[in-house]
Design a protein with these regions (language model features):
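Long, polar/charge-rich, low-hydrophobicity segments
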Residues: 85, 91-98, 118-129, 134-137
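Radical SAM enzyme core and accessory elements
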Residues: 141-218
Length: 218
C-alpha cells in the first residue's frame, strides 16, 4: 500500500478478507533520503499507517526499501533498521495479542534512462554485498525477517537498463549460453552472464557503474 495515499477506510473494507499481510514502501530509511528521491512521506506517515493496520488485526507487515540510491550513507541504512525496530515497539504498545512479524525487503537501485537519476552510477556488486551484510547484522531483531534482491541480477539489470545497440551482442551470447528466466534468482547464472560479457566484449561497468556527463547521449 502506498503510504502517501493510505486510507484507513480502505483497510476497514478489506479487513474481512484473509489477512496474509500488508506491504508498505518507505523506500529509504531516513527523511533526508526520502526527500532526495521525492518520496513525499514522513516517518509519522509510516507509523500512523502501520499502526492503523495493526489495530485492525494485521499481523504480518512487509516493508520495502531500496539501497544504493544516490547520496546514500550508512546512516540511511541504519534508518531502515530503526524503522523496523520501532514498528515492533509500536505493536507492543498497541497490545494486540498473537504473533507479529515484520519483513524487511530490500532491492538494489538500478539507474534507468529518462529518470532524474539516469546519469548516476550504480553500486558495484561488492558494495551491494557489503550493504546487505551490514543490514543483516543490524536487523537481528526479534520477529524481524530480512531478505534482499540478488546483487548479480541487479548488475545485469543495470547494464541492460542504459545499454545501446552493442548490448544486442550480449543478449545473443547470453541466449546461446542458455540464459533465460534470469529475473528469478533460481534461474540466474552469474557464470553464464560473465561468459556472455566476455564473448561479446562488453564492459559491464561502462554501462552500469559509470557516472555519466549530463550532455551524454543515451
Amino acid at each position: 500500500l502506498r503510504l502517501d495515499s493510505f486510507s484507513f477506510e480502505v483497510l476497514e473494507q478489506i479487513q474481512g478478507y484473509k489477512k496474509s499481510g500488508l506491504t508498505f514502501a518507505p523506500e529509504a530509511g531516513t527523511q533526508r533520503l526520502r526527500d532526495v528521491i521525492n518520496k513525499g512521506i514522513t516517518e509519522e506517515d509510516i507509523f500512523t499507517s502501520v499502526g492503523q493496520a495493526i489495530e485492525l488485526g494485521w499481523r504480518n507487515i512487509k516493508l520495502y526499501f531500496m539501497i544504493g540510491l544516490p547520496t546514500e550513507t550508512y546512516e540511511d541504512l541504519d534508518g531502515i533498521a530503526d524503522i523496523a525496530k520501532k514498528i515492533t515497539y509500536l505493536n507492543k504498545q498497541i497490545g494486540i495479542p498473537g504473533r507479529f512479524n515484520v519483513t524487511v525487503s530490500v532491492s538494489n537501485f538500478v539507474p534507468k534512462a529518462h529518470t532524474p537519476f539516469q546519469w548516476c552510477g550504480q553500486d558495484k556488486v561488492e558494495s551491494f554485498r557489503e550493504k546487505h551484510e551490514y543490514l543483516l547484522q543490524k536487523l537481528k531483531i526479534k520477529n524481524v525477517k530480512f531478505n534482499y534482491h540478488d546483487d548479480g541480477v541487479s548488475v545485469i539489470e543495470g547494464i541492460l537498463a542504459r545499454g545501446d545497440r552493442r548490448i544486442g551482442n550480449l543478449l545473443l551470447a547470453a541466449h546461446q549460453l542458455g540464459c533465460k528466466f534470469d529475473g528469478w534468482s533460481e534461474f540466474f547464472s552469474k557464470k553464464r552472464w560473465e561468459e556472455a560479457l566476455s564473448i561479446s566484449g562488453i564492459d559491464g561497468s561502462f554501462y552500469a557503474s559509470r557516472e555519466r556527463n549530463e550532455d551524454e547521449v543515451f
